[in-house]
Amino acid sequence: IVLALSACATLPPLQEMSNARQTIAAAKEMNPMTEQSEKIQEAERLLSRAERRMEVNLYESARQDALRAQKEAIEFIEWAISQSNDRKQDD
């Protein structure tokens, strides 16, 4: 049982990486100014670090970076939506 659990813990975080990439892509589609956003820059930096960590089998660290990258992108999306709603209310 212990071997089975440790094997699960060392699997590459492929789904987390994919989720982060998709969330970053969605954020970029929402707003043309996304590239200049500190949140998106941080998300991309974390995703790059996750990719490097995955290459050297640091899967748990890579998983954490991918999750943080996705979180940064989600926070940007939430901010962009609130900005859009604020502009609509001003009209």
What is each model feature region?
Residues 1-8:
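Sec-dependent bacterial lipoprotein signal peptides
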